[in-house]
Amino acid sequence: MTMMDMNFKYCHKIMKKHSKSFSYAFDLLPEDQRKAVWAIYAVCRKIDDSIDVYGDIQFLNQIKEDIQSIEKYPYEHHHFQSDRRIMMALQHVAQHKNIAFQSFYNLIDTVYKDQHFTMFETDAELFGYCYGVAGTVGEVLTPILSDHETHQTYDVARRLGESLQLINILRDVGEDFENERIYFSKQRLKQYEVDIAEVYQNGVNNHYIDLWEYYAAIAEKDFRDVMDQIKVFSIEAQPIIELAARIYIEILDEVRQASYTLHERVFVYKRKKAKLFHEINSKYHRI
């Protein structure tokens, strides 16, 4: 195993640890594509964790500077400051793919702002946040998952990322509240007459369910729109993207089956993932 292979393996371990659903799906890509996904996921994970886990603004700055070095001089040797193995893997990808570096910087800017979290006044602010933390990831992955990047391809990948982030929010309402964060907008909380603290203490009520389902309907519509346009991605990537998205959309039904609880984090069981795999495999005849 070469040093570069070890770098990619390290990135893969990060992906498997933090997103079993993504790993389950994207590990089915051809080797070069899946390695690129591992590297990009690992970079995005480190960006997210720099503040949330490590509380280290200097580390986030180092990540940004390392990415800028790769963008400016992709073929030169660099003394990376943040995580050398991840950055070497990213540099290798950048030498072969047209990376949307600005999307990395948009993600970093969102993480900077997230240090001083305040509740969103409107849904527009919430959806802007979903773009910043996840739509950006869709954009960065676009050259890996498509043969020819077009405006439509970037748009579909962006919308998929935003939809998955909204599903994350719907899954983690209780956990986020425990961390003093409420991502639903004040506008919508007022409209549906919901107080998250009251729901957390006293249990789910119809007002909360209606609010939750309002946002779930948005995520489900975006999912359907992405599936309708899935052919913008490469033939190899289409079944993989559909599998990842189908696994994620199942989270919403798991929350429903758990009675919308704020005190338990739901997940999609391996048996369900395997069933989805076989359904999509039959559809495409090729995974």
Curated annotation (Swiss-Prot):
The cofactors named for this UniProt entry are:
Mg(2+)
UniProt lists the family membership as follows: Belongs to the phytoene/squalene synthase family. CrtM subfamily.
- What keywords are assigned to this protein? Carotenoid biosynthesis, Magnesium, Metal-binding, Transferase, Virulence
Q: How is the cofactor bound here?
A: Binds 2 Mg(2+) ions per subunit.
Q: Which residues bind (2E,6E)-farnesyl diphosphate 2?
A: R45, Q165
Pathway(s) annotated for this protein in UniProt = Carotenoid biosynthesis; staphyloxanthin biosynthesis; staphyloxanthin from farnesyl diphosphate: step 1/5
Q: Which named protein is this?
A: 4,4'-diapophytoene synthase
Q: Might you name a Gene Ontology BP term for this protein? A: carotenoid biosynthetic process
Q: Which InterPro entries match?
A: Isoprenoid_synthase_dom_sf, Squ/phyt_synthse, Squalene/phytoene_synthase_CS, Trans_IPPS_bact-type, Trans_IPPS_HH
Q: Name the reaction it catalyses.
A: 2 (2E,6E)-farnesyl diphosphate = 15-cis-4,4'-diapophytoene + 2 diphosphate
Annotated residues for binding of (2E,6E)-farnesyl diphosphate 1: H18, S19, K20, S21, Y41, R45, R171, Y248
The species is: Staphylococcus aureus (strain bovine RF122 / ET3-1)
Q: Which domain of life is it from?
A: Bacteria
Q: Which PROSITE patterns match?
A: SQUALEN_PHYTOEN_SYN_1
EC numbers listed for it are: 2.5.1.96
Sequence positions that bind Mg(2+) 1 = D48, D52
